[in-house]
């Protein structure tokens, strides 16, 4: 993998603590291990008052009972990451503009797709609200690999505590012996230390993932910007701050940008709402691939002697090493990756096609905005960075273009309803080979008898109805 899994990279790149800042190597800020005239058993870990404060915070974090990863901490770190660069509340005027843009966009989409509206309510979110609304899905996606990292950390202490002490940095071993009453105390604790290390690992992974989600919140423009259904069903949401950032450097009016991005958001919701299998299949493809990633516990164990306990970023840096996380080279893993990449390309290609058709002559700069989306993806936008970090998947711009071209050609060859009817079952959709060589698929789609599907898509409750965003859209969104 070229990148560590999502949430495991160091926030802000390599400029974090890097070489340890002022920690001073193994001596840390408290001086060398041999310079401890007061006999403070905590040594480089700080003075007693600082350590007492740290212990209180540590106890609060260790009280987490929600699973392997501390997701409460992840949410707090994500919100702090967003707030660090400013995250003002959404003004009522901006909220009204977003709601009106989604309503208009949804109306235009009625003419270019057989899928009815998938939007029950339209909202404008701050970046912190995006974090709150999407974190439940991130929890589902990140748990498989995060739990493996936490288990690997706990497994380092599952053996002989005396051996473990010899592998740890001297300062960390001394501190643990001081707390537990020497090696005998450590041996007595046994599995208790392993459980504690898992809790610590859960805190570190939660903090890392929170920083990654917070960083992503500063880049996205909507709830579906990364290509996954991250937000609540039926809630179309745009981030006014993200929309404004997207428009920087474009000679396009703010209103036109807002409507164009609202069309992309509403188009995603139509697909996710009226293709019952799509949401679960997309998320399952990510989870399946993540489950096939293994953590190299031996490499993590080898890194432990170099970790400086006085540097709080040291364990984070160890976890950010991409070499620790390796995908299994199995047919099942390759198949999961291919399914995910193809399905993401098909979703993006369909959205791009219907948005281009709906914009038509209504938005004079629709072509320029579509090109801006393509450039954003080619240079590594939120979607590309998310999947590169989450599962090591680099979305290929060529496949995205091929998918858009195929959907456009299908529209011309067969019309809107037969094109959309292909979403009735995953086996009807183009494969990766079809995207690369579309002619045979286009001929097959033309000859395929799908008359029983051409009456239009249905929901699980019965025939789909035309329904747009409601007046509930004045709801301020997630708390």
Name each region found by the language model.
Residues 78, 83-96, 100, 217, ...:
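An N-terminal structural lobe/cap that precedes and organizes the functional/catalytic core
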Residues 228-244, 312-330:
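A short mid-domain helix/strand-loop element embedded in enzyme catalytic domains
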Residues 326-479:
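Pan-zinc metallopeptidase signature
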